[in-house]
Amino acid sequence: MRMYGFRARKPTVKTRLPRWRGVLSAWLAVVSASVWAQAVEPVEIQPGIWMVQGASALGTPANRNFISNAAFVVTADGVVVIDALGSPALARELVAAIARVTPQPIRHLVVTHYHADHIYGLQVFKDLGITITAHQQGQAYLHSDNAQLRLKASREELAPWIDAQTRLVPADRWVSDTTRFTLGGVEFVLQPAGPAHTPEDLVVVLPRQGVLMAGDLVFRGRVPFVGQADSGRWIEALNRLLSYDVRTIVPGHGPASTSAVADLQLTRDYLQHLRRTMGDAARNLEPFEEAYAKADWSAYAHLPLFKAANRINAYNTYLLMEQSAP
């Protein structure tokens, strides 16, 4: 067969490498993750109440975006899961881990908020026919340009774990007020807590067990990601949570807490420090760089992700306080 406009030649190393570079990178990411990545391993924090803990890190292909927590509660009539982790692969591992713990079927999944590291596993539960519940403000995020842009970026930055098959999944049931249900004798209270970390923040309380599934309202033992959050309302939400009669907290990030008050206060105090230092600078028309350089960060500089998160947290808070300055 004659070929026009092209003269076949034997591939060299230089001509072959670009063709295979993308495939090789993806393969190496899979191999690296399978060897080194943290396992989705449940830990029982109270009888019948389990959690899996993600890494205190930014999401990368190497950690498979396993940087957030999920929890599940085993009852006599089925399992309730809180959050879906940061990729379909992680969600499948979570489903398998639950099956190793109990033969009970998964009945419900509750979304604490629609951030990527908590929701990119939702499609696995959706495809299994599990009822998904979330706060109605999550609908605004799903229909936003930001959600689509974040998913597009994740497909590039977190491949192969987030890919063209990863999709945004709406809840089956949207709630706006305090919602209670009982399964297998266990009472669950879904309490709207936003706008705080996000507009759709939803916490899960198990009153009899004294357990609070706090989502990203609480980052235990690390600097939180503030992003575009209204930190003032976040502080108000934490103050409300401090009035709850709970002994154990499952945070959105970090290990479970049995010192509920202390860990709620750590996140709250960090946010208050941001608002105080950046608020003073904004009111005094002090440039951000100068204000950031002279601020005292010593109480938080030792915490994981301080270098990755603190500066952008401070800058976003500076902009927020600048808008509200008289």
Where in this protein do the model-derived segments appear?
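Metallo-beta-lactamase
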Residues: V40-I45, Q139-A193, P199, P207-R208, ...
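Active-site metal-binding motif and surrounding structural segment of the metallo-beta-lactamase
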Residues: A76-V80, P88-A134, Y244
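C-terminal regulatory/interaction regions
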Residues: R283-P326
